[in-house]
């Protein structure tokens, strides 16, 4: 769909991402353009309240914003109490495999930090870097080997595969995990040797109010004692209840699953 098609349809509002804002500024001449941040968890509650006002759903928006903020704060309190030296050093592939990893300030990184992990990319991408906040930063394989991550996570999925709510078949997630684990140059990494390569569904870490839930799954994996009272599946049920949909979270969200690691 092109922006010209949108203009022909003449919607009341156009909701767009920050990355695409430059492509559609001209639409603002004829359509009310809305561009808000609903991806990073610290902005989600405020963004939902604004949308609630715009679309005359203020009560629902207040309920969701309160739940989201409470969930976010609850998980953050746990991770804030974990000593920095006890937080494992990790890398996260988001949009593709190989040696491209998410940087600090991105929505994926915020899920990692909320789960009590240290992002190794922070060592080379600082807040004043043009790559800060990027979801894919290319590094050399030699650098990865030098850093020796304790865990490697990915939300990448072969376009021909499914995960998340779409299936209970783990083959797609397993394919991504195996692709990372089978990289011969990384065979001596602690993450590979210890079987600490995981797929987490992009739905849980890619924004839209779910980052705290993704962080709950990761936190439960990385710090089972500290996150003992957190039930990620229950948080997902609570989230789904806002959509009046089936509240039993069935699908492939984390692979290998938490149950497989017990």
Description of each model-found segment:
Residues 1-262:
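N-terminal ligand-binding lobe of clamshell/alpha-beta domains
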């Amino acid at each position: 769909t092109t922006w010209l098609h949108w203009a022909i349809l003449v919607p009341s509002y156009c909701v767009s991402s920050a990355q695409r804002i430059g492509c559609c500024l001209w639409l603002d001449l004829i359509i009310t353009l809305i561009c808000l941040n609903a991806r990073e968890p610290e902005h989600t509650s405020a963004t939902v309240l604004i949308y609630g006002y715009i679309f005359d759903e203020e009560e629902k928006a207040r309920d969701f914003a309160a739940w989201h903020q409470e969930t976010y704060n609850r998980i953050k309190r746990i991770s804030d109490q974990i000593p920095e030296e006890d937080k494992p050093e990790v890398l996260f592939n988001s949009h593709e495999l190989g040696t491209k990893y998410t940087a600090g300030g991105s929505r994926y990184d915020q899920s990692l930090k909320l789960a009590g992990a240290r992002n190794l990319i922070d060592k080379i991408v600082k807040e004043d870097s043009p790559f800060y906040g990027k979801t894919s930063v290319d590094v050399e394989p030699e650098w990865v080997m030098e850093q020796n991550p304790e865990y490697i996570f990915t939300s990448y999925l072969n376009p021909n595969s499914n995960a998340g709510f779409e299936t209970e078949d783990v083959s797609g997630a397993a394919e991504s995990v195996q692709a990372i684990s089978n990289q011969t140059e990384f065979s001596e990494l602690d993450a590979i040797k210890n079987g600490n390569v995981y797929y987490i569904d992009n739905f849980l870490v890619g924004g839209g109010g779910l980052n705290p839930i993704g962080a709950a799954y990761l936190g439960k994996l990385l710090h089972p004692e500290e996150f003992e009272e957190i039930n990620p599946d229950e948080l997902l049920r609570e989230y789904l209840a806002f959509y009046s949909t089936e509240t039993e979270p069935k699908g492939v969200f984390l692979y290998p699953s938490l149950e497989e690691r017990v």
